[in-house]
Amino acid sequence: MASTVVAVGLTIAAAGFAGRYVLQAMKHMEPQVKQVFQSLPKSAFSGGYYRGGFEPKMTKREAALILGVSPTANKGKIRDAHRRIMLLNHPDKGGSPYIAAKINEAKDLLEGQAKK
Protein backbone atom coordinates (compact mmCIF):
# COMPACT_ATOMS: atom_id res chain seq x y z
CA MET A 1 0.00 0.00 0.00
CA ALA A 2 2.75 2.44 0.95
CA SER A 3 4.76 1.62 -2.18
CA THR A 4 1.70 2.34 -4.33
CA VAL A 5 1.26 5.75 -2.73
CA VAL A 6 4.94 6.53 -3.29
CA ALA A 7 4.72 5.41 -6.94
CA VAL A 8 1.63 7.58 -7.51
CA GLY A 9 3.35 10.54 -5.86
CA LEU A 10 6.46 10.14 -8.02
CA THR A 11 4.32 9.86 -11.15
CA ILE A 12 2.46 13.07 -10.30
CA ALA A 13 5.74 14.86 -9.58
CA ALA A 14 7.22 13.66 -12.88
CA ALA A 15 4.13 14.84 -14.75
CA GLY A 16 4.41 18.23 -13.07
CA PHE A 17 8.07 18.62 -14.02
CA ALA A 18 7.36 17.51 -17.59
CA GLY A 19 4.50 20.01 -17.86
CA ARG A 20 6.71 22.80 -16.53
CA TYR A 21 9.42 21.91 -19.04
CA VAL A 22 6.93 21.95 -21.93
CA LEU A 23 5.56 25.35 -20.90
CA GLN A 24 9.05 26.83 -20.70
CA ALA A 25 9.95 25.37 -24.08
CA MET A 26 6.78 26.87 -25.58
CA LYS A 27 7.77 30.35 -24.38
CA HIS A 28 11.05 30.06 -26.27
CA MET A 29 9.32 28.76 -29.41
CA GLU A 30 6.59 31.43 -29.50
CA PRO A 31 8.41 33.87 -31.85
CA GLN A 32 9.20 31.05 -34.29
CA VAL A 33 5.59 29.84 -34.29
CA LYS A 34 4.31 33.39 -34.92
CA GLN A 35 6.75 33.78 -37.81
CA VAL A 36 5.58 30.53 -39.39
CA PHE A 37 1.91 31.53 -39.14
CA GLN A 38 2.64 34.96 -40.64
CA SER A 39 4.50 33.40 -43.57
CA LEU A 40 1.52 31.19 -44.49
CA PRO A 41 -0.63 32.57 -47.32
CA LYS A 42 -3.82 34.29 -46.18
CA SER A 43 -5.85 32.24 -48.65
CA ALA A 44 -4.99 29.07 -46.71
CA PHE A 45 -7.45 30.10 -44.01
CA SER A 46 -10.05 32.01 -46.00
CA GLY A 47 -11.91 28.86 -46.98
CA GLY A 48 -12.72 27.54 -50.41
CA TYR A 49 -16.44 28.04 -50.30
CA TYR A 50 -18.83 30.67 -51.59
CA ARG A 51 -19.40 33.39 -49.00
CA GLY A 52 -22.96 34.51 -49.32
CA GLY A 53 -26.54 33.38 -49.13
CA PHE A 54 -29.03 32.48 -51.80
CA GLU A 55 -30.54 35.02 -54.18
CA PRO A 56 -34.34 35.53 -53.91
CA LYS A 57 -34.70 34.35 -57.53
CA MET A 58 -32.04 31.85 -58.58
CA THR A 59 -29.79 32.93 -61.43
CA LYS A 60 -27.93 30.73 -63.88
CA ARG A 61 -24.63 31.70 -62.22
CA GLU A 62 -25.90 30.78 -58.76
CA ALA A 63 -27.27 27.46 -60.03
CA ALA A 64 -23.89 26.65 -61.56
CA LEU A 65 -22.13 27.52 -58.28
CA ILE A 66 -24.48 25.26 -56.32
CA LEU A 67 -23.89 22.28 -58.59
CA GLY A 68 -20.22 23.03 -59.16
CA VAL A 69 -20.49 23.01 -62.94
CA SER A 70 -20.03 25.54 -65.71
CA PRO A 71 -23.11 27.65 -66.53
CA THR A 72 -22.87 26.21 -70.06
CA ALA A 73 -22.55 22.55 -68.98
CA ASN A 74 -24.49 19.89 -70.87
CA LYS A 75 -27.34 17.88 -69.34
CA GLY A 76 -25.12 14.88 -68.60
CA LYS A 77 -22.71 16.90 -66.47
CA ILE A 78 -25.59 18.63 -64.71
CA ARG A 79 -27.24 15.30 -63.87
CA ASP A 80 -23.95 13.80 -62.64
CA ALA A 81 -23.26 16.82 -60.43
CA HIS A 82 -26.84 16.78 -59.10
CA ARG A 83 -26.65 13.09 -58.27
CA ARG A 84 -23.28 13.44 -56.52
CA ILE A 85 -24.44 16.36 -54.38
CA MET A 86 -27.82 14.84 -53.53
CA LEU A 87 -26.15 11.62 -52.39
CA LEU A 88 -24.15 13.72 -49.92
CA ASN A 89 -27.03 15.93 -48.79
CA HIS A 90 -30.24 13.92 -49.06
CA PRO A 91 -32.85 14.79 -46.39
CA ASP A 92 -33.51 11.10 -45.71
CA LYS A 93 -29.86 10.74 -44.68
CA GLY A 94 -29.68 13.77 -42.42
CA GLY A 95 -29.26 16.49 -45.03
CA SER A 96 -31.08 19.80 -45.06
CA PRO A 97 -34.44 19.84 -46.89
CA TYR A 98 -33.89 23.52 -47.73
CA ILE A 99 -30.49 22.85 -49.29
CA ALA A 100 -31.90 19.84 -51.16
CA ALA A 101 -34.66 22.06 -52.57
CA LYS A 102 -32.07 24.60 -53.72
CA ILE A 103 -30.00 21.83 -55.35
CA ASN A 104 -33.10 20.58 -57.19
CA GLU A 105 -34.01 24.13 -58.21
CA ALA A 106 -30.49 24.63 -59.58
CA LYS A 107 -30.71 21.40 -61.58
CA ASP A 108 -34.10 22.32 -63.02
CA LEU A 109 -32.92 25.81 -63.98
CA LEU A 110 -29.75 24.60 -65.69
CA GLU A 111 -31.41 21.64 -67.42
CA GLY A 112 -34.06 23.97 -68.84
CA GLN A 113 -31.32 26.02 -70.48
CA ALA A 114 -28.81 23.25 -71.28
CA LYS A 115 -28.14 21.49 -74.55
CA LYS A 116 -28.64 17.76 -74.86
Curated annotation (Swiss-Prot):
Keywords: Acetylation, Cardiomyopathy, Chaperone, Membrane, Mitochondrion, Mitochondrion inner membrane, Phosphoprotein, Protein transport, Translocation, Transmembrane, Transmembrane helix, Transport. One of its GO terms (biological process) is visual perception. It is found in: Mitochondrion inner membrane. Residues 62-116 form the J domain. Residues 25-116 are mitochondrial matrix. SMART domains: DnaJ (SM00271). Ubiquitously expressed. It is a single-pass membrane protein. The chain crosses the membrane at residues 4-24. It comes from the Eukaryota. Pfam families: DnaJ (PF00226). Residues 2-3 are mitochondrial intermembrane. GO terms for cellular component: inner mitochondrial membrane protein complex; matrix side of mitochondrial inner membrane; membrane; mitochondrial inner membrane; mitochondrion; PAM complex, Tim23 associated import motor; protein-containing complex; TIM23 mitochondrial import inner membrane translocase complex. GO terms for molecular function: ATPase activator activity. The keyword Cell inner membrane does not apply. The keyword Phosphoprotein applies. The modification Phosphoserine is found at S39, S70. The modification N-acetylalanine is found at A2. Mitochondrial co-chaperone which forms a complex with prohibitins to regulate cardiolipin remodeling. May be a component of the PAM complex, a complex required for the translocation of transit peptide-containing proteins from the inner membrane into the mitochondrial matrix in an ATP-dependent manner. May act as a co-chaperone that stimulate the ATP-dependent activity. It is linked to 3-methylglutaconic aciduria 5: An autosomal recessive disorder characterized by early-onset dilated cardiomyopathy, growth failure, cerebellar ataxia causing significant motor delays, testicular dysgenesis, growth failure and significant increases in urine organic acids, particularly 3-methylglutaconic acid and 3-methylglutaric acid. Interacts with PHB2; the interaction associates DNAJC19 with the prohibitin complex. Interacts with TIMM16/PAM16. May be a component of the PAM complex at least composed of a mitochondrial HSP70 protein, GRPEL1 or GRPEL2, TIMM44, TIMM16/PAM16 and TIMM14/DNAJC19. Belongs to the TIM14 family. This is Mitochondrial import inner membrane translocase subunit TIM14. The gene is DNAJC19.
